[in-house]
Amino acid sequence: MNVRRPTPDDLAPAVELLRAVEEADTGEAEWDERQLREHWSTLELEHDVWLFEVDGRLAGYADLEVRPGGRVMSDGYVHPELRGRGVGSEILRLAEEEARRRTDADGGRLYLQNATTSHADGFYRSRGFSPVRRFRRMAIELEREPEVDVPPGVVLRTIHRGEEPAIHALLEDAFAEHWEHRRRGYEEYAERTFDRGDYDPTLCPVAEVDGVLAGASLNWWKDMGDWGWIGTVGVVPAFRGRGIGEALVRWSFAELFRRGERRVALGVDAQNETGAARLYERLGMRTLWEAAVWEKELRGAAS
């Protein structure tokens, strides 16, 4: 097995690997070159990313991000045709070694995310990891344009050009208590949202109450091939419980339908305290697949 750091020339083969893993584990391939290029822009390739080769083939991918409080987030992928060759074990070994090296004191924690399968669950448990959070990919097949019921006292409109900083602030407040949320400055946030070439403010609804921004949804047209994508739905705490989240999602369904989308998907924290997953189920969305985040407490310094 050969383990090395990637170069920009590895982008396309890395995406091919990630898509093969997604297709095998979830039935849906979502990664594309734009997404991985954006992800790599937040990492240092020579320190945070590994490629694993077996018999000259790209067999595995892993990356790692250190967050405040001694938390280390890592993602790992093994090509479905090359599983059982020790790649997954090597990914975990390197991730743990690097996490210990980068967290100075005992009590650091390493988090890994993987699609939920009996094999993956057994693999992580056998190496001292425990599941701490579950996330779902949910979708709906739209047969007709949904009706949108706007709650009393609420105004729904689309984002106005130039108010993106205010929308960013709203969504940061809405997700401030979300599990493992990391507050990002506007420039970093906009790089993955408002500055994208396919960002369309006329596809993104905003809710106002008495002229105050109360909630918003960032949506993307054909972001996943023939799927519409609801990227972020947030309602600030002071305005929750008034049906605003449901109105934003219904509006998003309706506008995507008018633009020709018949399938719409989103990702959600299955344990979100606001009950978002239950809301989406009530609106007719079904779970396509579920992924677990696994945690291991790191004790002792790296050797």
Give the location of each predicted region.
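Short amphipathic alpha-helix that is part of the acyltransferase structural core
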Residues: 1-37, 149-183
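N-terminal charged segments
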Residues: 6-55, 60-63, 69-72, 93-96
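A conserved beta-strand-loop-helix scaffold within acyl/acetyltransferase catalytic domains
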Residues: 25-45, 62-70, 178-234
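Hydrophobic beta-strand residues of extracellular immunoglobulin-like
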Residues: 48-51, 203-206, 250
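Acyl-donor-binding surface of acyltransferase catalytic domains
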Residues: 65-152, 292-296
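A conserved beta-turn-beta hairpin within the catalytic core of GNAT-like acetyltransferases
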Residues: 66-76, 83, 106-107, 201, ...
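Conserved acetyl-CoA-binding loop-helix of GNAT-fold acetyltransferases
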Residues: 84-100, 232-236, 241-258, 263, ...
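C-terminal "cap" of GNAT-fold acetyltransferases
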Residues: 136-157, 262-274, 284-303
